[in-house]
């Protein structure tokens, strides 16, 4: 990290008191949000409050053993991230320290305090291919060259947004480190492949647009019923064991984003281990290249210091915005925003601020809004179009959706995927409750599905929603009087709804074929169930008893469409078989 260099250290202060991750210093020459180094070991921290001669600092490392009288040094710069080639296929902690580099420095699997490293390798050579010539005019955000960062990602070197721009007077080509100048402007400014950006400040864009294209996730219930747009926001709240992390992993694996930034914020370390183990073995369905080649991991697990959780979300979204400026579609997974909010609550209570609901700070809603509003579909300052989609998991204690983090998140996000403990106990996965979930992007995304999948996509989806709604209403009656007391048409509706639940809404994340379902296959499964519905009701009207309709041999084959590789032929055969068997009954 740029602030790790410690060369620009200014006036010293002295520690006055220590309370967990919050340190108070006296006589420190610093501004709000400046990065400081605390104590004899130089622990990294950030200024969060200044009152007279006292400066309050949140420290991103364990503070045990740090005491009053030890020095505090200010860098005079805010918390920034290093941006440049080398971030893909990397794994960072919450303040962008590369964990593999730290491990090699310490010869240990455990982090020592005070150890630091830049976010990207400043000495590694990259092949720079210029896209500008001498005499060209460039402005902030313009692309001046490209670097093959991974087999999947072409890294675009841009004029930093805080540069003035001007005429190109010198251009280099060949292998350079990220700190060497590759383009020189007439103003004397030198452009390198390395940029720095403060994490709490959104990167500028020319225009924020209405999203029109879905972020295809490969999960039937999401793409079919509750889609999220590229540049959209979604929340996945749910109790423990309901499948938040597996859903996030599925989205990180199969979403059709160009780049995925996965932020593990305060969750268990073995969940990040699973990502590191699984992703290198999987191929991107869009390009066929390894998934890690488009993925950046930020691991701030539950056994790491609380204060660093607060910064890891900002680190992730800043990296996402940087790739968005290159014209890429980026998906950011935050697992879990509840742990981030709990970190804010702890810092707030240490500062003795007035608590809000359930002890969370009064500014919880503002911080959540600040984060989610950095998502969007943008025209960048260089005229490219790029997006940042944010999908945040929420972990309400006991699955109580009325708690502050869930409620404040719901006011902001436009897609809500409610995970249900009852569905998880019944082994219905993904355990997304179709009666509570919603997407406000449906109408603006329907034209894309109509153009790219089928003309009657919206009608088929609405039919499925209506059947599931009717089943929900009938369930109350069934629990009172039993299924056999219902009229035959309602019994048949319950049977159709069962196939919708089992064949369409359920999906096996661990099956090699069923783990990813294209929009075309999602539509195909729905039309197969709809065809069974139409033929079954024709048979019922012709006087065939509902028991005989339910007993046909072809119907259970609907549940096996998801695992078929040659699903198109399978669906055609199945439709013909269902029609034939039902028509034999009347």
From Swiss-Prot:
Cell membrane in keyword set: yes
Catalytic reaction annotation: ATP + H2O + 4 H(+)(in) = ADP + phosphate + 5 H(+)(out)
Species this protein is from: Haloferax volcanii (strain ATCC 29605 / DSM 3757 / JCM 8879 / NBRC 14742 / NCIMB 2012 / VKM B-1768 / DS2) (Halobacterium volcanii)
HAMAP family: ATP_synth_A_arch
E.C. number(s) listed in UniProt: 7.1.2.2
Compartment(s) where it occurs, according to its Swiss-Prot or TrEMBL record: Cell membrane
Family recorded in the similarity comment: Belongs to the ATPase alpha/beta chains family.
GO biological process, one term: proton motive force-driven plasma membrane ATP synthesis
NCBIfam families for this protein: ATP_syn_A_arch (TIGR01043), PRK04192.1 (NF003220)
Protein name: A-type ATP synthase subunit A
A GO term for molecular function: ATP binding
Disulfide bonds: none
Secretion signal span: none
Pfam family, one: ATP-synt_ab
InterPro entries documented for this protein: ATP-synt_VA_C, ATP-synth_a_Xtn, ATP_synth_asu-like_sf, ATP_synth_asu_arc, ATPase_a/bsu_AS, ATPase_F1/V1/A1_a/bsu_N, ATPase_F1/V1/A1_a/bsu_N_sf, ATPase_F1/V1/A1_a/bsu_nucl-bd
Cellular component GO terms, alphabetical: plasma membrane; proton-transporting two-sector ATPase complex, catalytic domain
Function: Component of the A-type ATP synthase that produces ATP from ADP in the presence of a proton gradient across the membrane. The A chain is the catalytic subunit.
Protein topology in the membrane: Peripheral membrane protein
Keywords associated with the record: ATP synthesis, ATP-binding, Cell membrane, Hydrogen ion transport, Ion transport, Membrane, Nucleotide-binding, Translocase, Transport
Main subcellular location of this protein, as a coarse class: membrane
């Amino acid at each position: 990290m740029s602030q790790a260099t410690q060369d620009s250290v200014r006036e010293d202060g002295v520690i006055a008191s220590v309370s967990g991750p919050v340190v108070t210093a006296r006589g420190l020459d610093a501004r709000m949000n400046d990065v400081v180094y605390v104590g004899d070991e130089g622990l990294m921290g950030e200024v969060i409050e200044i009152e007279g001669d006292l400066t309050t600092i949140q420290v991103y490392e364990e503070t045990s053993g740090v005491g009053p009288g030890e020095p505090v040094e200010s860098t005079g710069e805010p918390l920034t991230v290093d941006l440049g080639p080398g971030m893909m296929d990397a794994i960072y902690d919450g303040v962008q320290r590369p964990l593999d580099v730290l491990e090699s420095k310490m010869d240990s699997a455990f982090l020592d305090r005070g150890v630091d490293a830049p976010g990207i390798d400043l000495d590694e050579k990259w092949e720079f291919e210029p896209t500008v010539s001498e005499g060209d005019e460039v402005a902030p955000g313009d692309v001046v060259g490209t670097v093959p960062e991974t087999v999947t990602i072409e890294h675009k070197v841009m004029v930093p947004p805080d540069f003035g721009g001007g005429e190109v007077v010198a251009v280099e080509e060949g292998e350079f480190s990220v700190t060497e100048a590759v383009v020189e402007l007439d103003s004397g400014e030198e452009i390198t492949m390395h940029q720095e950006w403060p994490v709490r400040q959104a990167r500028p864009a020319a225009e924020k647009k209405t999203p029109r294209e879905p972020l295809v996730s490969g999960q039937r219930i999401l793409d079919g019923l509750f889609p999220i747009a590229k540049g959209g926001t979604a929340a996945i709240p749910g109790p423990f064991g309901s499948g938040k992390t597996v859903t996030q992993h599925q989205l990180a694996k199969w979403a059709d984003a160009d780049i995925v930034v996965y932020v593990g914020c305060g969750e268990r370390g073995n969940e990040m281990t699973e990502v590191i183990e699984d992703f290198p073995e999987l191929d991107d369905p869009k390009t066929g290249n390894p998934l890690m080649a488009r993925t950046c991991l930020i691991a701030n697990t539950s056994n790491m210091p609380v204060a660093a959780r607060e910064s890891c979300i900002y680190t992730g979204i800043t990296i996402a915005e940087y790739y968005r400026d290159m014209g890429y579609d980026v998906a950011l997974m935050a697992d879990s925003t509840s742990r981030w909010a709990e970190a804010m609550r702890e810092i707030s209570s240490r500062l003795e601020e007035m608590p809000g609901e359930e002890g969370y700070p009064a500014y919880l809603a503002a911080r959540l809004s600040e984060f989610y509003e950095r998502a969007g579909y943008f025209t960048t300052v260089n005229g490219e179009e790029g997006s940042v989609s944010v999908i945040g998991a929420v972990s309400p204690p006991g699955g109580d959706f009325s708690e502050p983090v869930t409620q404040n998140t719901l006011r902001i996000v436009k897609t809500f995927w409610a995970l249900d403990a009852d569905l998880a106990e019944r082994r219905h996965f993904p355990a997304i409750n179709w009666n509570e979930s919603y997407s406000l992007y449906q109408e603006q995304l329907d034209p894309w599905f109509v153009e790219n999948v089928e003309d009657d996509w919206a009608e088929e989806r609405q039919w499925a929603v209506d059947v599931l709604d009717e089943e929900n209403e009938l369930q109350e009656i069934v629990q009172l009087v039993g299924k056999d007391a219902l009229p035959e048409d309602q019994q048949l509706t319950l049977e159709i709804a069962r196939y919708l639940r089992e064949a369409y809404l359920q999906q096996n994340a661990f099956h090699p074929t069923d783990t990813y379902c294209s929009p075309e296959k999602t539509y195909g499964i729905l039309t197969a169930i709809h065809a069974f519905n139409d033929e079954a009701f024709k048979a019922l009207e012709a006087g065939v008893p509902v028991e005989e309709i339910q007993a046909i041999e072809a119907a259970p084959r609907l549940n096996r469409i998801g695992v078929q590789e040659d699903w198109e032929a399978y669906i055609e055969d199945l439709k013909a078989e269902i029609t034939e068997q039902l028509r034999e009954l009347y």
